[in-house]
Swiss-Prot record:
Protein name, entry field: ATP synthase subunit b
Subcellular location field: Cell inner membrane
TM helices/strands, residue ranges: 4-24
Taxonomic lineage: Bacteria, Pseudomonadati, Campylobacterota, Epsilonproteobacteria, Campylobacterales
GO cellular component, as recorded: plasma membrane; proton-transporting ATP synthase complex
Pfam family for this entry, one: ATP-synt_B
Ion transport among keywords: yes
InterPro entries per record: ATP_synth_b/b'su_bac/chlpt
Length: 170
């Protein structure tokens, strides 16, 4: 109602201060008719317009809420993904550390095994050298004895023969 009154007051100066010229105008009647028409439209359509805009506001609010829920769900997923990423990085670091310690222990085991093999090979070499040396000594003694026993021009006593063998062996 206040709007109609304000609209009427706003248009009143136009109607009141209009100069009358040679031509008659019906501006006052047209203004009054327009105000009546606007009031009737307002009376008939105000509830429908208000309902339309209220429903539109509610639908926009519902869409906004839906978008905000989707946004929040997306942010939660991003947060979860970041947590999983951090856990994966920690697990990767632990696996790397574990692998490094495993590598060190394997290196140490291999080094120990190689050292033990080298020691065994050296021991076997020394034993084989002793065996070969004793074989060579036996062979030399056998050759010397055979040579001495086969030659008739050398006549030695048992004691001399033992002394010769001991000298050759030593």
């Amino acid at each position: 109602m206040k709007r109609i009154l304000l609209l009427g007051l706003a248009l009143a100066p136009v109607a009141l201060f209009a100069s009358q010229g040679a031509v008659e105008t019906d501006i006052v009647q047209r203004t009054v008719n327009f105000i009546i028409f606007a009031a009737i439209l307002w009376y008939l359509l105000a509830d429908k317009i208000k309902a339309f805009f209220a429903n539109r506001t509610l639908s926009i609010q519902a869409e906004l809420d839906k978008v905000q829920e989707t946004l929040k769900a997306s942010q939660d997923k991003v947060t979860d993904a970041q947590k999983k990423l951090e856990e994966a990085r920690k697990l990767a670091a632990e696996i790397i550390e574990s692998a490094k310690t495993d590598i060190d222990s394997v290196k140490q085991k291999v080094t120990t095994a190689v050292d033990a093999d080298i020691t065994n090979l050296n021991r076997n070499l020394e034993e084989m050298m002793k065996i070969e040396t004793s074989k060579a000594k036996k062979q030399v003694v056998a050759e010397v004895l055979e040579e001495l026993l086969s030659s008739e021009n050398i006549k030695l006593t048992q004691q001399e023969l033992v002394d010769v063998v001991l000298k050759k062996v030593a």
